[in-house]
């Protein structure tokens, strides 16, 4: 049976939907209508394709990581090089698509949330390109962790609003951005950065990010004589790079799909972001999905060395994949991710983002159990420039025995 999700109400099985206040329903309905029309408009897709090719630099390479493969001694590992996109990560695929959509809707202002800053930079970039007013909401903790990306956003002409509510991280930035959207509904478009939020956001983000998996499918077929890979893998916070990798393979049952979520200091602590391992269904940011919550249903704080993965929920389509067993999700600790960060740097000369390092760490475990005639494709979602100082300080502190 061909996979057809979401349904007309924006649900993936029991997950997703539109759990938003009445004040936002108008905007959500308007967005849904505009998106359906844009999807059917070949000129919209042609403009986006042109930007992806000539501005972003797509298609990105599918690179055979031979030294990493030899080191692990299992499956042939290929890296989908989303780190080579303009702005350094997969986030630009979605940001450009949504700014084009906002322009089509006649909106003049763009707002967005960001954690690691990559979505903020991508959104500020797209807004600069189309001469649109841009405000980025970012948790105060992330503003400190990602000072370089904050400067990049400001350099691109965006205003960065430091959010001091709650735990001052990504979920609080989403709350602030949603509030700002309510206040400026007539002239403002909110660009959700991950496959989260009320319908149609998870579907929009999935569709714009699916360029990743579509390219992989074509590229791998070219080098393998028309075959499909045995497995695909990506890190998962909200889940946009993972859904972009997975979705084009969802009907190919022979292709295993793996997501690497962040278990921070460990699943036996409260310092993690392992929603599938430790969460349960609840409503957050306008959708029903698996979330980290306490016994009273209060959303718990997520924790990860990676600013892009410390979100206490996972997008609804991933929740559905997890429930029906279509994808397998495993958790990776900070320490394992740091080892992955070092390993890829030293073996392949590629410094990955800390988010992507979680996928590299999981790839070591999964590839080792596979045979050399099998293939595993890992989405290298972003480059590690933004994380180098943070990792440097961490290694120095460890060397001093702190």
Swiss-Prot record:
Its cofactor is pyridoxal 5'-phosphate. SUPFAM superfamilies: Tryptophan synthase beta subunit-like PLP-dependent enzymes. InterPro entries: Trp_synth_b_CS, Trp_synth_beta, Trp_synth_beta/beta-like, TrpB-like_PALP, TrpB-like_PALP_sf. One of its GO terms (cellular component) is cytoplasm. It catalyses: (1S,2R)-1-C-(indol-3-yl)glycerol 3-phosphate + L-serine = D-glyceraldehyde 3-phosphate + L-tryptophan + H2O. The modification N6-(pyridoxal phosphate)lysine is found at residue 91. Keywords: Amino-acid biosynthesis, Aromatic amino acid biosynthesis, Lyase, Pyridoxal phosphate, Tryptophan biosynthesis. It comes from the Bacteria. Pfam families: PALP. GO terms for molecular function: tryptophan synthase activity. Pathway: Amino-acid biosynthesis; L-tryptophan biosynthesis; L-tryptophan from chorismate: step 5/5. Its EC number is 4.2.1.20. The beta subunit is responsible for the synthesis of L-tryptophan from indole and L-serine. Tetramer of two alpha and two beta chains. NCBIfam families: trpB. Belongs to the TrpB family. This is Tryptophan synthase beta chain.
């Amino acid at each position: 049976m061909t996979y057809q999700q979401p349904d007309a109400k924006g649900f993936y099985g029991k997950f997703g939907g539109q759990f938003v206040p009445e004040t936002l329903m108008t905007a959500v309905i308007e967005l849904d209508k505009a998106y359906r029309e844009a999807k059917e408009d070949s000129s919209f897709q042609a403009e986006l394709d042109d930007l992806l090719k000539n501005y972003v630099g797509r298609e990105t390479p599918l690179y055979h990581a031979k030294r990493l493969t030899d080191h692990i001694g299992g499956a042939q590992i290929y890296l989908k090089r989303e780190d080579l996109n303009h702005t350094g990560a997969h986030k630009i695929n979605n940001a450009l698509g949504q700014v084009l959509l906002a322009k089509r809707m006649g909106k003049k202002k763009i707002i967005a949330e960001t954690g690691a800053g990559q979505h903020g930079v991508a959104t500020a970039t797209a807004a600069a390109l189309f001469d649109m007013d841009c405000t980025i909401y970012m948790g105060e903790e992330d503003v400190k962790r990602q000072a370089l990306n904050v400067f990049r956003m400001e350099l691109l002409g965006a205003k960065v609003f430091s959010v001091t509510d709650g735990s001052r991280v990504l979920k609080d930035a989403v709350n602030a951005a949603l509030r700002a959207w309510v206040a400026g509904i007539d002239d403002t478009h909110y660009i959700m950065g991950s496959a989260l939020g009320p319908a149609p956001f998870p579907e929009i983000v999935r569709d714009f990010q699916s360029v990743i998996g579509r390219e992989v499918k074509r590229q791998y077929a070219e080098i393998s004589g028309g075959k499909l890979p045995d497995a695909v893998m990506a890190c998962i916070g909200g889940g946009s790079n993972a859904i972009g990798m997975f979705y084009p393979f969802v009907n190919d049952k022979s292709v295993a799909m793996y997501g690497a979520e962040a278990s921070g200091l460990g699943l036996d602590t409260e310092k993690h972001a392992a929603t599938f391992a430790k969460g349960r269904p609840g409503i957050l940011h306008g959708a029903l999905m698996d979330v980290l919550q306490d016994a009273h249903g209060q959303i718990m704080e997520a924790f990860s060395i990676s600013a892009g993965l410390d979100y206490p929920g996972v997008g609804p389509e991933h929740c559905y994949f997890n429930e029906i067993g279509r994808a397998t999700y495993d958790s990776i600790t900070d320490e394992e991710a740091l080892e992955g960060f070092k390993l890829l740097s030293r073996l392949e000369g590629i410094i990955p983002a800390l988010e992507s390092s979680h996928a590299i760490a999981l790839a070591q475990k999964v590839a080792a159990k596979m045979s050399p005639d099998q293939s595993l494709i890992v989405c290298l979602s972003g480059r590690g420039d933004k994380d180098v100082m943070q990792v440097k300080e961490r290694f120095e502190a460890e060397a001093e025995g702190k």
